[in-house]
Design a protein with these regions (language model features):
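Alpha-helical assembly-interface signal, strongest on the long, hydrophobic N-terminal helix that forms
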Residues: 1-75
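Short, conserved structural patches
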Residues: 60-144
Length: 144
């Protein structure tokens, strides 16, 4: 190592810049991946909250006393899209590929993609698109 540092041919400088470049590249990749996971978690939380709210808001209350739970599936589909569009932050876009549900048992599942800006997007027009699947169900758990 000492001989490499005393070498006047410049190989230590080239080695230093090569290692510095590799370290910076690794740092940027770690930061980008961390930012991507943070954005994905934020979008996933909003979508899950939206589908939970859609199921709860569209439960048919007429039969609840008899422990019969029914879901207005069409209303829940519309509510999910409205809740998600209202809560999604600026710069995020989501597309719904399919929303399926059943009235009894009350269950709703949505699949699609969400797109958000990359961490280093100011240095280029880049965005990241990931898929999502969210599911919500409503079951009686009062034990009667």
């Amino acid at each position: 190592m000492r001989r490499l540092l005393r070498d006047r041919a410049g190989s230590a400088t080239i080695l230093f810049f090569g290692l510095f470049f590799a370290l910076m590249l690794f740092s940027f990749l770690v930061l980008e991946m961390g930012g991507t996971m943070e954005h994905y978690d934020r979008a996933q939380t909003i979508l899950q909250r939206s589908i939970n709210s859609a199921v709860e808001a569209n439960m048919d209350e007429r039969y609840r006393a008899d422990r019969v739970l029914r879901l207005n599936v069409e209303g829940a589909k519309a509510s999910f899209a409205a809740f998600a569009a209202e809560d999604m932050p600026e710069g995020y876009t989501f597309t719904v590929q399919s929303v399926t549900g059943t009235a009894d048992p009350p269950m709703l599942t949505a699949k699609g993609t969400v797109t958000f800006p990359a961490l280093f997007s100011p240095f280029g027009d880049r965005s990241i698109t990931v898929g999502y699947t969210v599911r919500a169900a409503n079951f009686a758990v009062d034990g009667r």
